[in-house]
Each structure stands twice: as C-alpha cells, then as structure tokens.
C-alpha cells in the first residue's frame, strides 16, 4: 500500500512539474533562441539509470536538479530536487542555455581542468537562471 501511495504522489508531482514546463518552456525558447527539446521528469538521476545503491551514490556523487543530455537532446528534471516553480524555471533556463552552447567546446573546457564552479558555459547558464522571475505566475 505504501508503495502505491508513493507512486501516486510521484505521478501527481511529475504532472505538476510538467504543467510548469508546458507553460514556461515555450517562452524560454522564444526568448533565448534555439529549438525546444523534449523534457522528461524523473525522481532522480540514479533511479533514471536504474542504479544500485542509490543513497550511497547520492552521498558520494551528488543528486542534481536537472541535466541536458546532448547525445539524445533531452532535458531531464529531477523531481526530488526540482519541485518548486522557481526550481523548475531556473533549471529550464539553465539547461536550455546548455542546448545553445557548442558541446565539443563544453567538453574540451572540462578536459582542460575547468569544473562546475568555474566553467564558462556553466557560469553562462547560471546567469540565465537570474531571469527566472520573468516566467513565474504573477
């Protein structure tokens, strides 16, 4: 019974997240340029990839809010961390910015020693998040 309740809560939560995505993502694309990408909602990255030892992985490797996969062109939002209107909008702005960036250069800069905290493309994506209030429900 608990498992069913958890699953129902997850479905409701994911539907709420999807409704924010449906409302704001087209405007984000219009404002920033580029093309709309598919957006998928999962509880967390580790469940998405069917990992074993999820709690250990979260502690050791983190638990991101969202990510963009340039190989399949999908933006992933993780409901465990991205579940408020602000979180969703910020994540969409951040990840859509990555869809506009040169992915070979993105990887090259990481290979050269940049990390999440100082990578120029991450800094650009973080700056894009600052405009999140433009998209919130008034």
Regions found by a protein language model. Give the residues of each.
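Active-site scaffold of zinc-dependent metalloenzymes
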Residues: 52-86, 103
């Amino acid at each position: 019974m608990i498992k069913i309740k958890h699953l129902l809560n997850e479905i409701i939560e994911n539907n709420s997240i999807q409704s924010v995505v449906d409302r704001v993502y087209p405007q984000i694309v219009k404002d920033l340029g580029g093309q709309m990408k598919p957006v998928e909602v999962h509880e967390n990255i580790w469940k998405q990839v069917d990992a074993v030892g999820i709690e250990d992985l979260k502690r050791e490797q983190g638990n991101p809010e969202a990510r963009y996969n340039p190989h399949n062109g999908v933006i992933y939002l993780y409901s465990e961390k991205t579940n408020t209107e602000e979180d969703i909008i910020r994540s969409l702005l951040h990840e859509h910015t990555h869809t506009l960036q040169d992915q070979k250069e993105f990887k090259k800069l990481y290979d050269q020693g940049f990390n999440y905290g100082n990578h120029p493309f991450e800094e650009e994506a973080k700056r894009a998040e600052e405009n999140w209030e433009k998209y919130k429900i008034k």
